[in-house]
């Protein structure tokens, strides 16, 4: 089939690679003139890694991934370790090591694998309509194209989603701002092989290793939306928000490069049931935009890619039937993880002070099993289990 994908993010690229593996002719159209990753890095948990392994990318993703052997929570104000444990039991349980990876490097790898010659930049879709067994897509430059299937991988502001649902879905602000970037690994920040998270006051500062001796860092602060966003003031702003925190966090803020640091107001969307309409189907954030609090946004987009490609391959009654079966497989799991991330977000960022304070106390008693079981419950249920 001739498949058009709108959006060249992780979901669109992974879907394109998967569909090409099954012999489809696939073209990706991206509205941006230049591909720029949203965020510095991503924690790619084992279910997402397995999806890339399935597509033959196991060596490539292993080269990009950091060596994350341990996990720790640290009191952000005192610097006291609350809990620290090995992730090896988790890795053995699910059968695959997780890989924190640079978003830019992951996106470049996926673009190379898909084929850059089939990615068209600066093409913004403005309208679509279905005609018999085809979909007509119109672009802002006046051009149009026909496809047998249209995959909407156009993110949290998806135009394709508006078409599928018949209405626009507004994003929900999650209540916190996230600053993220990359810094060199250094022992005065955190151990090199550990995901370390400093917590306190409903805020957090987190570091996880990616390839080439770098930490991916992020700092979260509960704030109202719409505040000033001036890169030149990032350091002094963060120093103000994290005043009185331990030396490791102060050192992180001092070392970050404001011009290479991203600031994101974190949002999600209310889960919905309809992932397709006729021959138009949604994947990734267009279908189930989530907060990053359980690290499953990119992983779920990759699961979508595998399920969609397989459903179109093995179900031969009709394209619509294959898309319906894709929806039935993906809807419950993806939407459940959106709500699970939302719940985790509220606890982490002190929506209820008593609940978050109780969580801090639980962390001091944690031996690792409870946290790992929670992560495992997010990982299992992927299409390759």
Swiss-Prot record:
Disruption phenotype: Cells lacking this gene are auxotrophic for urate. Growth defect can be complemented by introduction of XCC0279 from X.campestris or Mvan_5278 from M.vanbaalenii. The keyword Membrane does not apply. Its cofactor is FAD. GO terms for biological process: purine nucleobase metabolic process; urate catabolic process. One of its GO terms (molecular function) is NADPH binding. It comes from the Bacteria. Substrate binds at residues 178, 204, 216-218. Its EC number is 1.14.13.113. InterPro entries: FAD-bd, FAD-dep_Monooxygenase_BioMet, FAD/NAD-bd_sf, HpxO. The record marks 204 as: Involved in substrate activation for the transfer of oxygen from the flavin hydroperoxide. FAD binds at residues 11, 30-31, 43, 125, 285, 295-299. It holds the Pfam family FAD_binding_3. It catalyses: urate + NADH + O2 + H(+) = 5-hydroxyisourate + NAD(+) + H2O. Pathway: Purine metabolism; urate degradation. Keywords: FAD, Flavoprotein, Monooxygenase, NAD, Oxidoreductase, Purine metabolism. Belongs to the FAD-dependent urate hydroxylase family. Catalyzes the hydroxylation of urate to 5-hydroxyisourate (HIU). Is involved in the urate degradation pathway to allantoin. Homodimer. This is FAD-dependent urate hydroxylase.
